[in-house]
Amino acid sequence: MTQAYDHLSEWFEYLNDDCDYPAWSQYFLSGLAALGAGRKGLEVGCGSGAFCRALAKAGYEMTGVDLSAPMLDKAARLAREEGVRVRFFQADAAVLPMREQFDFLLAPNDCYNYIMPEKLPAAFRKAAARLKKGGIFWADVSSAYKLRGKVANNMFADDRDEVTYLAFSRLFPDRVE
């Protein structure tokens, strides 16, 4: 999966322009405020850093981790261009090698769906270890219905003047790739 995102890094946000990042970021900001979260956050599977940047602009101290080095390069470049300070690290969600703890951990865009089943328990243990006592774990995941009924054995395409994107998925007994 990392290799696919490596190749998408320059086009990721462009191809996801239908995702309302500002509204979704506002949803996170409202939720974090309502839950009384502290100001130090970790985003797992941060990709190009859209949520890290939005939360940093709102005064949060953000760290983003992702497996894809090119996506992290893009994230760091966009953060610099937007004048926000975010730390980015290449890391596997099942490892999360940093020792510090965070007030909250975000994992939007169903990033935990991309973790192989045998690594998922370690990923959740690492997420818990990275949270301060009482910290907030906020993740979304795709349902079995979506994966089996909408994504599996399907093709997705986006043809634009600058780029054409084709993705194929296959259903396996324990996962969709």
Residue ranges and their predicted role:
Residues 97-104:
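A short acidic, Gly/Pro-enriched loop at the edge of an enzyme's catalytic core
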Residues 113-114:
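A short His-aromatic
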Residues 121-133:
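A short glycine-rich, Lys/Arg-flanked "PGG" loop and its adjoining helix->strand segment in the class I
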Residues 118, 138-177:
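SAM-dependent methyltransferase
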Residues 1-36, 38-45:
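Conserved class I S-adenosyl-L-methionine
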Residues 50-95:
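Class I SAM-dependent methyltransferase SAM/SAH-binding core
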Residues 108-109:
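Residues lining the SAM
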